[in-house]
Each structure stands twice: as structure tokens, then as C-alpha cells.
């Protein structure tokens, strides 16, 4: 999924802003208090509409990103000598390019199609008037997933990751080798749009991967894909090892100035 453009109205410090996004990469630059974080939070809330439509996901803060009381624009009131929220509700409108895909289990081939969809959020509940195209897109993914065994195909789910600077210090030391009781979809999207990082869940998954694979509960190669994604995102990493004894990832890193890692 690629967001083509986003319109933000009456949200935090923005009364009206329009952003057209590059399909490959976007860098947000600006002085403090100019709205860099506001734009990122608006994208989180926009994508929260997708998570809300996923019936496979449980409820709770880890699986949602909705408007908060602090998101409303406030103006100074001379009569009350303080800031009060304006009457207009926040509104976030999105145009996105979505890839609908299915994996054919008999041929091991992936077939995809691309279409543009539109939706907007004005409250913490989706409606057909505001998000019908998104609701149909998610319903198609879920139906294909639900009928995977019968039809011999499976769905491709979009990847979401919201990563802010404060997330680096959240939950890092919380890794425990505990038994996972969440569904595959729940583990995939947990904390995707949250301020916290589900480090424990990721570590538990990689720690138990071989055992789960042997029991038929995992797909072959997903552990390598996970580690390759980390190395692709951080080019300095040359090698990753899983230290299950000490509950740690260990990595071999080569800095630009060094000849060897």
C-alpha cells in the first residue's frame, strides 16, 4: 500500500494541509513545532482505519490508532483565559494505491493487481460513506484468507510500520520466551501504529520459529525473510545471529570507515 496524498483538517496544529507523497521515499524537514510529528500521527490515524476493519484482529490499544481528545485544534478564548477546542472535528482524507494479491499454493506463484482507493476519517468508527472502498479492500483480503484451504490460494497483507524516535526505548528489555497465544495476523499487526515497540513479540516469534516450523505451524523461509529485511533496512549489518541463551540478537556490523566488520 502506498499513500499518494493526504489531506489533514482541524488536526492538532493544522487547520488545513495537503501533502503529496513520493511513492519511494519521503523526508520531512522542519523546525521544531512546525508539524513534522503531526503529519506522522495523521498517517497513523489514516491507516488505523484499515486495522479497524480487520475482523481477525482483537480489540485493544495495540491494534488500533484512533483520534484522541488532544488531537482537536484549540484556540485561545479571551473570556475563559485558556485554550478551548474548536467545533469542527478533525478530518483526515487519503488517496492510496493498494496492491491486491493472492498466493497460489499449487503453483507457488503470486498474482497481483493494483487499484487506487479513497477513504477519510472524521471519527473513530468507519462508515460506508467515508470508507467504502477501504472496507471492500479489507473484506476481499479477509475472505481470501478465510477460504484459503478451500480455494488453494492465500492473501497478501499490506505491511505497516510506524517508527518514531520514542519507540527506541520502549519495551526493548521486555523480551521473554513466553508461549504465543495470538493469531498470526494479530502478531503481525500488534503495535504497528502504536508508540510502543512489540520487541518481545518479535523475539518470541523468531526464538520459537524452528519448533513451530517442525510442527507445521510456520511457513518455511519466513525467518530468513525477517532477518534479511533487517539487513536491508540497516546496510551496516553483515550478519545476524540469534542468541537464544541470553535472549539477544547479535549482529556483525561494518562501519564505512572500517575495512572489516
Regions found by a protein language model. Give the residues of each.
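P-loop NTPase switch/coupling surface
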Residues: 1-201, 215-243
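Accessory N-terminal region flanking or inserted into the helicase ATPase core
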Residues: 222-226, 250-261
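Short Gly/Ser/Thr- and Asp/Glu-enriched loop/turn motifs at secondary-structure junctions
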Residues: 244-248
Amino acid at each position: 500500500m502506498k499513500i499518494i496524498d493526504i489531506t489533514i483538517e482541524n488536526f492538532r496544529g493544522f487547520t488545513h494541509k495537503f501533502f503529496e507523497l513520493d511513492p519511494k521515499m519521503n523526508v520531512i524537514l522542519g523546525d521544531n513545532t512546525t508539524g513534522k510529528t503531526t503529519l506522522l500521527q495523521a498517517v497513523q490515524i489514516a491507516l488505523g482505519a484499515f486495522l479497524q476493519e480487520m475482523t481477525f484482529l482483537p480489540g485493544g490499544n495495540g491494534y488500533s490508532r484512533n483520534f484522541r481528545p488532544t488531537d482537536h485544534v484549540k484556540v485561545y478564548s479571551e473570556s475563559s483565559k485558556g485554550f478551548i477546542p474548536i467545533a469542527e472535528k478533525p478530518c483526515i482524507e487519503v488517496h492510496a494505491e493498494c496492491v491486491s494479491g493472492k498466493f497460489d499454493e499449487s503453483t507457488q506463484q503470486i498474482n497481483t493487481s493494483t487499484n487506487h482507493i479513497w477513504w477519510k476519517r472524521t471519527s473513530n468508527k468507519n462508515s460506508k460513506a467515508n470508507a467504502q472502498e477501504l472496507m471492500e479492500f479489507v473484506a476481499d483480503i479477509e475472505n481470501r484468507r478465510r477460504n484459503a484451504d478451500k480455494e488453494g490460494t492465500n492473501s497478501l497483507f499490506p505491511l505497516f510500520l510506524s517508527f518514531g524516535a520514542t519507540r527506541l526505548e520502549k519495551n526493548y528489555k521486555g523480551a521473554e520466551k513466553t508461549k504465543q497465544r495470538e493469531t498470526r495476523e494479530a502478531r503481525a499487526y500488534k503495535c504497528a501504529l502504536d508508540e510502543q515497540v512489540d520487541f518481545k513479540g518479535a523475539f518470541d516469534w523468531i526464538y520459537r520459529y524452528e519448533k513451530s516450523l517442525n510442527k507445521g505451524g510456520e511457513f518455511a523461509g519466513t525467518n530468513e525473510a525477517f532477518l534479511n529485511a533487517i539487513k536491508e533496512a540497516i546496510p551496516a549489518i553483515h550478519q545476524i545471529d540469534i542468541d537464544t541463551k541470553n535472549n539477544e540478537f547479535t549482529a556483525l556490523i561494518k562501519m564505512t570507515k572500517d575495512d572489516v566488520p
